[in-house]
Amino acid sequence: MRKLGRSWWIAGIASAVALTTAGGPALAATGPGGFSLRPVYQADDFAHGQAMFILPAGENGLVNAAQLTQFEATGQRPPHSQDQLAPYENLEFGYPSLTDSTLGKYYLGESFGVKTGQIIATQHPSPKVPVVIYRDTHDIPHIYGKTNAALAFGAGFAQAQDRLFLMDVLRHYGEGTLTSFLGPSCADEQMDHDELLLAPYTTAQANAQINALPTEYGAQGRLAVQMIREYVQGINAYITKALTDPTLLPVEYTLFGPPKPWTPADVVGVAGLIGGIFGDGGGGEIANSALLRYLQGQLGQSGGATAFTDFKEQNDPAAPTTVVGTSFPYEIPGHVNPATIAIPDNPSAPLQGGPVDTTTGCSATAPSKAGLSVIESLLRFPSQMSNALVVGAGHAADGHPLAVFGPQVSYFAPQILMQEDLHSPGYAAQGASFPGTGFVELGRGVDYAWSATSAGSDLTDQRLELICNPNGGPVSPTGTFYEFKGKCIPMVNETFPDGAISGKALDHKIHLTVHGVVQGWTTARGGKPVAVVNQRSTYNHDVDSVIGFLGFGEPALTHSAKSWMAAAGHIDYTFNWLYVDSKDIAYYVSGLDPVRPSDVDPNLPTWGTGGTEWLGFLPASKHVHQINPPQGFFDSWNNKPAPLFSASDGQYGYGPVYRVQMLTTQIQHQFALHHGKITRADLVQAMETAASQDLDGLTILPALLHAVAGRHEPAGVNQMLAALRTWYASGAHRILASPTATQYKQADAVAIMDQLTPAVIRAIFDPLFAAGGTNSGGYNVFPMGFVNEPYNGGSHLGSAYDGGWEGYTLKALDQFTGTGVAQPFGSVVTAKLCGSGGLSTCGPALDAALLSAYQALVKANGGSKNVSTWTKDANTVATGLTMPAYDAIGFRSLGIVGQPSIPWQNRPTFQQVVSFPAHRPA
């Protein structure tokens, strides 16, 4: 088998699959008459009404031509496209008084089935397929199939009904063919180019991935293939109906041509895209090389290498982790052999050759406004977000574990997730699914629930292939032969057609080696041509994770924390998975994690000549995992999973500060308030309190106040510091006083913090990263920005504070004040901080930062020196936005009709609140 350490789960699959595909009931509660197609409310549902969820803005994503006309005339959106927006938004203002009995004001019920009298539509997608779709009062589909195949057919039909155009966008994006779908434009070409550098599969190769599942996974693989094929048939059944019924056809197709039938290969395209965005990690070795070279230029070879290690924080003992006190060593190198390191001569230089980003004339044809809107939305796709709070039975008021969790996938119109409730003799799950995939990826089963946050484990390496000439002559700078294990072998060359530009066919030419896709060419070893290749462990296996997702929804396979972990172990993408049932909570970090030779530096490129090949993959027993932790809870907000589970080469934020600390603090606060026994509402309060907090105000600010205590500051600066102290004492929130307010409470402090944070960072680190202030070269090559602010560079993603310089700044300030630091900066770095005198000059540097921030804020606020009236900083002035509008959550349109912005909250897009007071009989 390709995957190590998983065969122990396969043994139990055959009997379980035989049970679920034979047509008999998976649970005795289905009754003596066999599986029922009726959506009986809470049948085989052990949550007893204590499972809830929300997904703004609404389930319905279909806008037909008549509805568009109505919207343009009256502003009225289609039914159920916005009915979850207000409950989601209003939690920010209602959470302080929240109780279990009022959760229903902010969340929908996630019970199986539909209450009597709440079915608004009943659909029979095909007279030949035994499946029925029931729509509830929020238009959420509850799909009941007589067989697993029938269920999959119904899921395809329902997903097409709610998200057909979005699914079309995703399949073309995942296949690198947006240009042929949305029309020619430079932006389309660029996105196709970038996607083909990640997953350049021909239709035959994509189909081969699916066809290989039975060989790899036996009966479970055969079931997956059957369900994928029937899912596609369900999509096509809807397309057939929509082509003859204008009320079923998304209006976007009047602009881009009628929808074309789906194939199983399209599912691979969507799966690869979603997994590549949310479930990948690593691949930053070339960028790391650029930072290393910069630091060595400033500090010398040895000093630069030491500084690089300091800033990389691969295993900082102060990093907050989800598993506490138990180590899971991964990527801990021994003595690194310098000969294995392959750094380009100029790692900052653009790569040469390879598929061109855009073709000459790509701008000759103006893109459609609708197509451009879609592209702009896709360019702001989020990555690596999501949070989870899971509390064990010992801290639950009723003795049953609690969970408040979900993915942060940004905000789209229609939403990039959809809700569904799926039932067949062998499958029972409700929750969220990525349209184009079919299964419930995040949700609840009969007596358990699960969710995920992106983990970012190191699945991808960058290698340098040494170019050669098979005839022994001169080597071309962009040659397509390379050395591997002593031989000069050819690359595989593939051509991907992608529409036409100015009447000429547009083709993307892709080159592949034994390691992966060629990203381009450069030089190393003093001018020798090399090709840069990304080696991704999940390459050509993008659909394999369906085995794990399928298992999550199969009651015969998932019936306990351990059996759920077994399913999670079959997900190759890198996610932090969290689980809850009536007795247990559990955590498992999935990913097809390569095992590398011990003499390789995992943070830098390696040679592809054959001497540093992967040694297999991390077995399940060595993945981070735990059931019922000693601390009584799990929380995850994309932080480090466990001690010694190394930060991937692309992760620089795993130092002493991470946003998960806001969740930890609030969970512990709820424990203290309620004598260690909390409710679902208490846990929601913990989550929502953190959702409006400013991480910089909670971490950098107290250290800064300590650092400048007793220093003589101007009167205006002292007024600023007083406002900041008051704000910090009240929780450092960025929140409106009421839903109708136009400015933040304590707006002066929010403006001060936003202006001051980058000033403090630069005061400390400019001597190293801006060469004493003469340039910004070091910052330009650093793989992480100062602060991941809510504005997100104009993307308005909602998620914020996911990695930044808070940890570095806290370390430097604590070292300046003599406060203990678990893993301090070494002397080679501290000698460069703040000024020529190193750390000893940080006092005057901080004074200057405070004064510069004060002066900038006076200017931003029209010359006012009355700190209490400030409502702006330099950024809000530059954009012309108020601070709440600057932070606000924006819904990016993936269709014709959008959604309004809402006030900022740093919480999951799709969120579940669950507890199970009972469990099925053993």
Residue ranges of predicted features:
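C-terminal/peripheral segments of proteins
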Residues: 29-698, 713, 726-922
